[in-house]
Curated annotation (Swiss-Prot):
UniProt keyword Chloroplast, yes or no: yes
GO BP annotations, alphabetical order: response to water deprivation
Compartment list: Plastid, Chloroplast thylakoid membrane
Intrachain disulfide bonds: none
UniProt keyword list: Chloroplast, Membrane, Plastid, Thylakoid, Transit peptide
Self-association state and partner proteins as the record states: Associates with the major light-harvesting antenna complex polypeptides of the PSII oxygen-evolving complex.
Stated role: Required for normal plant growth. May be both photoprotective and play an ancillary role in photosynthesis. May structurally stabilize thylakoids during osmotic and oxidative stress.
Tissue: Expressed in leaves.
Family stated for the protein in its record: Belongs to the LIPC family.
Primary location: plastid
Protein name listed in UniProt: Light-induced protein, chloroplastic
């Protein structure tokens, strides 16, 4: 049936043949006989033959496919033109939006600033300008109504809060650095945990505060700190010291200590396992002044900009975001 269906789709023209002899009429033609030319049988046959060979026949291809047995006519046959090539048009790459470009520029400007501590005045001005532009294009103008976006761990990438600068400057102490400052938010329990991780050649430890927050406006939350936590030092069983450290502008050679470190390597390994198994130290925060408010001025799924007391600004990036990669 597929062949019949295909044949029915071939266009055909009906050839009308005028008979050489016309039926007699009651009226006599006024035209002279010499002015009327009737084609002969030979000319008529020649005309038919020429048209038959000069008009090319359409080509078609029938392809057998599985079809429903209930369909008595079978599937429709797709006509394929000779020499046709199927071309799949690929969509052009999506151009980044203005917000994405601004976020990328901001991340590039933050690189090497040590969370703002080492930023020059020119870099600070550039960062402030980019922050202002992003705040004007905030995709979530009421962040407290989109609390699920606040969920998760946020890494501090930049701040102008001078109260954190003494903490950040501890990274300049020999063998000690601030590895990470983060804020973890749980919108279901309305809790916030601020954490600072310190790292050294012998161990890593953390200091955290747990707090509750309340929504006060579409952009503002009130935070009350309730508990402090000193994490158990996680000692490393493989101690690696640098060749030298810089302290107060002078380089101190640490090579004499390498022999001592090697001799106590096995002891440190056993101590690390015993200390790391101890629970962290927790203490309540009873000071009534241990509270603050936070205003979120920009929020999406990977970037958050907040402003705190005295106009200080915080730029935080969601853990796992490509913006954290230099």
């Amino acid at each position: 049936m597929a062949s019949i269906s295909s044949l029915n789709q071939i266009p055909c023209k009906t050839l009308q043949i005028t008979s050489q002899y016309s039926k007699p009429t009651s009226k006599i033609s006024t035209l002279p006989i010499s002015s009327t030319n009737f084609p002969s049988k030979t000319e008529l046959h020649r005309s038919i033959s020429v048209k038959e060979f000069t008009n090319p026949k359409p080509k078609f291809t029938a392809q057998a496919t599985n079809y429903d047995k209930e369909d008595e006519w079978g599937p429709e046959v797709e006509q394929i033109r000779p020499g046709g090539v199927a071309v799949v048009e690929e969509e052009p790459p999506k151009e980044p939006s203005e917000i994405e470009l601004l976020k990328k520029q901001l991340a590039d400007s933050l690189y090497g600033t040590n969370r703002g501590l080492s930023a020059s005045s020119e870099t600070r001005a550039e960062i402030v300008e980019l922050i202002t532009q992003l705040e004007s294009k905030n995709p979530n103008p009421a962040p407290t109504e989109a609390l699920t976006l606040l969920n998760g761990k946020w890494i501090l990438a930049y701040t102008s809060f001078s109260g954190l600068f003494p903490l950040l400057s501890r990274g300049n102490l020999p063998l000690v650095r601030v590895e990470e400052i983060s804020q973890t938010i749980d919108s279901e329990s309305f809790t916030v945990q601020n954490s600072v991780v310190f790292a050294g050649p012998l161990a890593t430890t953390s200091i955290s505060t747990n707090a509750k927050f309340e929504v006060r406006s579409p952009k503002r939350v009130q935070i009350k700190f309730e508990e402090g936590i000193i994490g158990t030092p996680q000692l490393t069983d493989s101690i690696v010291l640098p060749e030298n450290v810089e302290f107060l502008g002078q380089k101190i050679d640490l090579s004499p200590f390498k022999g001592l470190i090697t001799s106590v390597q096995d002891t440190a390994s056993s101590v690390a396992k015993s200390i790391s198994s101890q629970p962290p130290i927790k203490f309540p925060i009873t000071n009534n002044n241990a509270q603050s408010w936070l205003l979120t001025t920009y929020l999406d799924d990977e970037l958050r900009i907040s402003r705190g007391d005295a106009g200080s600004v915080f730029v935080l990036i969601k853990e796992g975001s490509p913006l954290l990669k230099p």
